Amino acid sequence: MRKSKYLVLNSFYFDFNDDLTEIIEIKSLFENQNILDLFRFDKLISIKESQFEFYNLNFLYLPKNIEIMGKYVFLNNQIQLLDLSNYINLRIIKSGVFSYNQIKQLKLPDNIEEIKWSAFLKNQIKILDLSNCIKLKNIREAAFRENQIKHLKLPKNIEKIEL
């Protein structure tokens, strides 16, 4: 993932805990932003459940060490391109994390293990290539429901796909 070219003054938009591992509060000034740039916050490994839902975000620049994105964290935004391929510590895509967006292009990390219920529900994904996700074992119910998938590639070692 490339670095953001945008200057985002995070102290105007967020309150962090003392060691910068968690966003405590999103300030009202952030409401009109369409870019979330947390790339420089290497200590941030987790984003709380529902923390950025309904913000009309178009672009995400997350810290490379991100491990956990809580359920519904980016629900109902305007994300179109989503490249998570460099987030090697991200093992599970939780329920509803990217539901109700506009995602057309999606790249996941090679070591993703599970995609939970409705993780990418109601997007615009047409080509879904998960063949590089060699540790992917489970795709849960409705994970990609209401997309426009025309071409699908899965890894050979997948164990369970729920419809």
Regions found by a protein language model. Name each.
Residues M1-I24, E31-S46, Y55-I68, Q78-R91, ...:
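Structural signature of tandem-repeat unit edges
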